[in-house]
Amino acid sequence: MIGKLKGLVDSQGEDYVILDVNGVGYVVHCSSRTLQNLPPQGQATALAIDTQMREDSIKLYGFASETEREWFRLLQSVQGVGAKVALAIQGVLRPGEIVTAIAAQDRAAFARASGVGAKLAARILAELKDKAPALGASLHTLAGAGSEGAGVEAPASGAVSDAISVLVNLGFGRSQAAVAVAASSKALGSGAGAGDLAKRALQELAQSG
């Protein structure tokens, strides 16, 4: 099994890149977003790899990060979502945007991907809400912070830090999370708890995405 490839960009097709690793060209299928972000031909790059073996073929799928690879696998756990559809979804939604869409039960976000209709979008939302470990844990954190934390005011810096951690666990970049939480803190005031800060930040990120 191949878990990672590091080499030179040789050429690109509609849905794949040929990666030259020590003179051997590997055909790696990628989302449109990943392909667009690859360096120019002849430049070095590294991709996290998911290897899928069938009776008549072996296919490699490449991702800019391990988080993207895990979402690729998780998306395929939904009935009706194969590798092609999973890549199509990742072509229009970043990991953090997938999480936001699931949390908001946003069918339209998934329906933007080729091959995803209203019924499949609804199935993805229903199944991944329970299957995504990071999502489930973070939503639980949000719920706890919003209820059990009532009446106990945490220091503002601690609440901000906790809210940022929640967003990072949901797949957002730390800098992106910090900006969103800072905006939430400014809007809600210094006494806001981590749960409220994270919830508002998620709303801000969903609107800006």
From Swiss-Prot:
<dbReference type="Pfam" id="PF14520">
    <property type="entry name" value="HHH_5"/>
</dbReference>
<dbReference type="Pfam" id="PF01330">
    <property type="entry name" value="RuvA_N"/>
</dbReference>
<comment type="similarity">
    <text>Belongs to the RuvA family.</text>
</comment>
<feature type="region of interest" description="Domain II">
    <location>
        <begin position="65"/>
        <end position="143"/>
    </location>
</feature>
<dbReference type="InterPro" id="IPR012340">
    <property type="entry name" value="NA-bd_OB-fold"/>
</dbReference>
<dbReference type="GO" id="GO:0000400">
    <property type="term" value="F:four-way junction DNA binding"/>
</dbReference>
<dbReference type="GO" id="GO:0048476">
    <property type="term" value="C:Holliday junction resolvase complex"/>
</dbReference>
<comment type="subunit">
    <text>Homotetramer. Forms an RuvA(8)-RuvB(12)-Holliday junction (HJ) complex. HJ DNA is sandwiched between 2 RuvA tetramers; dsDNA enters through RuvA and exits via RuvB. An RuvB hexamer assembles on each DNA strand where it exits the tetramer. Each RuvB hexamer is contacted by two RuvA subunits (via domain III) on 2 adjacent RuvB subunits; this complex drives branch migration. In the full resolvosome a probable DNA-RuvA(4)-RuvB(12)-RuvC(2) complex forms which resolves the HJ.</text>
</comment>
<dbReference type="InterPro" id="IPR013849">
    <property type="entry name" value="DNA_helicase_Holl-junc_RuvA_I"/>
</dbReference>
<dbReference type="InterPro" id="IPR036267">
    <property type="entry name" value="RuvA_C_sf"/>
</dbReference>
<keyword id="KW-0234">DNA repair</keyword>
<keyword id="KW-0963">Cytoplasm</keyword>
<feature type="region of interest" description="Domain III">
    <location>
        <begin position="155"/>
        <end position="209"/>
    </location>
</feature>
<keyword id="KW-0238">DNA-binding</keyword>
<dbReference type="GO" id="GO:0006310">
    <property type="term" value="P:DNA recombination"/>
</dbReference>
<keyword id="KW-0227">DNA damage</keyword>
<keyword id="KW-0233">DNA recombination</keyword>
<dbReference type="GO" id="GO:0005737">
    <property type="term" value="C:cytoplasm"/>
</dbReference>
<dbReference type="InterPro" id="IPR000085">
    <property type="entry name" value="RuvA"/>
</dbReference>
<dbReference type="GO" id="GO:0006281">
    <property type="term" value="P:DNA repair"/>
</dbReference>
<dbReference type="InterPro" id="IPR010994">
    <property type="entry name" value="RuvA_2-like"/>
</dbReference>
<comment type="function">
    <text>The RuvA-RuvB-RuvC complex processes Holliday junction (HJ) DNA during genetic recombination and DNA repair, while the RuvA-RuvB complex plays an important role in the rescue of blocked DNA replication forks via replication fork reversal (RFR). RuvA specifically binds to HJ cruciform DNA, conferring on it an open structure. The RuvB hexamer acts as an ATP-dependent pump, pulling dsDNA into and through the RuvAB complex. HJ branch migration allows RuvC to scan DNA until it finds its consensus sequence, where it cleaves and resolves the cruciform DNA.</text>
</comment>
<feature type="region of interest" description="Domain I">
    <location>
        <begin position="1"/>
        <end position="64"/>
    </location>
</feature>
<protein>
    <recommendedName>
        <fullName>Holliday junction branch migration complex subunit RuvA</fullName>
    </recommendedName>
</protein>
<dbReference type="GO" id="GO:0009378">
    <property type="term" value="F:four-way junction helicase activity"/>
</dbReference>
<feature type="region of interest" description="Flexible linker">
    <location>
        <begin position="144"/>
        <end position="154"/>
    </location>
</feature>
<dbReference type="GO" id="GO:0005524">
    <property type="term" value="F:ATP binding"/>
</dbReference>
